[in-house]
Amino acid sequence: MLNNAMSVVILAAGKGTRMYSDLPKVLHTLAGKAMVQHVIDAANELGAAHVHLVYGHGGDLLKQALKDDNLNWVLQAEQLGTGHAMQQAAPFFADDEDILMLYGDVPLISVETLQRLRDAKPQGGIGLLTVKLDDPTGYGRITRENGKVTGIVEHKDATDEQRQIQEINTGILIANGADMKRWLAKLTNNNAQGEYYITDIIALAYQEGREIVAVHPQRLSEVEGVNNRLQLSRLERVYQSEQAEKLLLAGVMLRDPARFDLRGTLAHGRDIEIDTNVIIEGNVTLGHRVKIGTGCVIKNSVIGDDCEISPYTIVEDANLAAACTIGPFARLRPGAELLEGAHVGNFVEMKKARLGKGSKAGHLTYLGDAEIGDNVNIGAGTITCNYDGANKFKTIIGDDVFVGSDTQLVAPVTVGKGATIAAGTTVTRNVGENALAISRVPQTQKEGWRRPVKKK
C-alpha cells in the first residue's frame, strides 16, 4: 500500500543504571555496533524523513558517538515517562506525516516488521506492535472488547484479572502526527508510577472511535529490550545465531556456528570454509574457496579467490589478491596489499606495504611503508626501518630480489631488480640492479677460547 511520509522518534534518555557503566546504555554494542545505531539504521532503511532522538543521560557521549548520523536531538531533562519523552519531540511533528516510536535499547527490531506495522496502520488510527508471552509479568497488558484493542494497562496498575492477559505491549507504535500531538496533550500522570505513559493514547484513540490494529513481530527477539549486560549478551547470541544460520544456508561452511561472530557485513563467494572462533568485523568480502583458520580476525578487508588464512591471524583494512597464503600468527595492518600468490608467514607484520606476485615473507618480519616487487624472497628477521622518530619513509624493493635473514633496510632506500642482500646486512644506501649488498663486519676466530666461569 501507499504510505504517508514518516518520521521516527527513538527514545534513548534512560540512565541504564543496571548496566553499572559510565557509558549511556544505548551506546553499549551488539555485534560491534551501538544498540541505538541498529535502531537508527532501521529507521533510515525504512525511509524516515526525520529521525528525532530523545536523550537525557550522557548527551555529550551520545552526540559524539552518533555525530555522523543526521539526527534531530531532543532533550528530555527529566525522565517522567515515555509519554513525557514523546511530548518533548511533539513540536517537531508535521500534521500530515506518520510518527513511528522506537527504542534505543531494542536493537534487533527488523525493517520487515516495521514495514508491516506501517502498512497495517489504519487511517486516523494506531498501528501497535504486540506479542503474546507465557509469562507476561511486568509488561503492559493489551485490553480488548469483542476482539478490538481498547487500551493498554501497565502491570502495576492492572487488576488481577487483567494480569492474566498474555498479550503485551512492546512499546512500538505508529500514528498520524496531528493525532499524536492531540493525544499527547491529554496525557496525565495519574497512575502508580506518577509518570506520563505513551500507552494511554491507545485508550484516548479508542474513545474517539479510532481503530487500533495490532501486529506481531516475526521473532520475539525483535522486541526484547536491554536493561543489563546479561540481557545484552543473550541478544548478542540470538543475533549471531541468526547470522550464522543465514550464512550456512547460503553455502558458507562454519565449522561451529556457535563459535563465529559477525560484527558487520560479509559478502562471499562459493565453498568458503571458516573454522572456530573467527570474528568478522566491518565490511568484509571473501572470494571463492577461501579458507580461514581458527581464531582469526578479519576487518574491513577483501580476500581474493583461493586464499588461505592460517590460525590466529589478524587482517585489517587489507587487500589480498587470488591464491595468497598468510599466517599462522600474522598481522596485516591498514594498507597491506598482497598480489596474486604472495605469502606472509608466521609472526610477520605488514602496514602500508605491498607484496608483489609470488613474493614471500616467511617469518619474523616487519614490512612497513614498503613497495615490494614480484618474486621477492624476504628472509627471516627482516625489518624495514621506516620511522626516524619524527617522520615515516618508504622502502622500495624491485622484482626478483633476495633479501637474506636478519636484514635491516633503513628508509628511504631502494633496492634494484635482481639484487641480493646478504644475511645480517644493514642497508643504508640504494642498491643497484643485480648487485650484492653486504655490510657485515669480517668474522674473526680465536682458537682455544675459554668461556668465563663463575666466581665461587
Swiss-Prot record:
Region: Linker, residue numbers: 230-250
Domain of life: Bacteria
Pathway: Nucleotide-sugar biosynthesis; UDP-N-acetyl-alpha-D-glucosamine biosynthesis; N-acetyl-alpha-D-glucosamine 1-phosphate from alpha-D-glucosamine 6-phosphate (route II): step 2/2; Nucleotide-sugar biosynthesis; UDP-N-acetyl-alpha-D-glucosamine biosynthesis; UDP-N-acetyl-alpha-D-glucosamine from N-acetyl-alpha-D-glucosamine 1-phosphate: step 1/1; Bacterial outer membrane biogenesis; LPS lipid A biosynthesis
One of the Pfam families matching this protein, by short name: Hexapep
Gene Ontology cellular-component annotations: cytoplasm; membrane
Cofactor note (record): Binds 1 Mg(2+) ion per subunit.
Active site location: H363
Binding sites annotated in the UniProt record for UDP-N-acetyl-alpha-D-glucosamine: 11-14, 25, 76, 81-82, 103-105, 140, 154, 169, 227, 333, 351, 366, 377
A single GO molecular function term of this UniProt record: glucosamine-1-phosphate N-acetyltransferase activity
Residue ranges, annotated region (Pyrophosphorylase): 1-229
Gene3D superfamilies xref list: Hexapeptide repeat proteins, Spore Coat Polysaccharide Biosynthesis Protein SpsA, Chain A
EC numbers for this chain: 2.7.7.23, 2.3.1.157
Cofactor (UniProt): Mg(2+)
Enzyme category, top tier: transferase
GO biological process, one term: cell morphogenesis
Function according to Swiss-Prot or TrEMBL: Catalyzes the last two sequential reactions in the de novo biosynthetic pathway for UDP-N-acetylglucosamine (UDP-GlcNAc). The C-terminal domain catalyzes the transfer of acetyl group from acetyl coenzyme A to glucosamine-1-phosphate (GlcN-1-P) to produce N-acetylglucosamine-1-phosphate (GlcNAc-1-P), which is converted into UDP-GlcNAc by the transfer of uridine 5-monophosphate (from uridine 5-triphosphate), a reaction catalyzed by the N-terminal domain.
Protein name: Bifunctional protein GlmU
Species this protein is from: Escherichia coli O8 (strain IAI1)
Gene of this entry: glmU
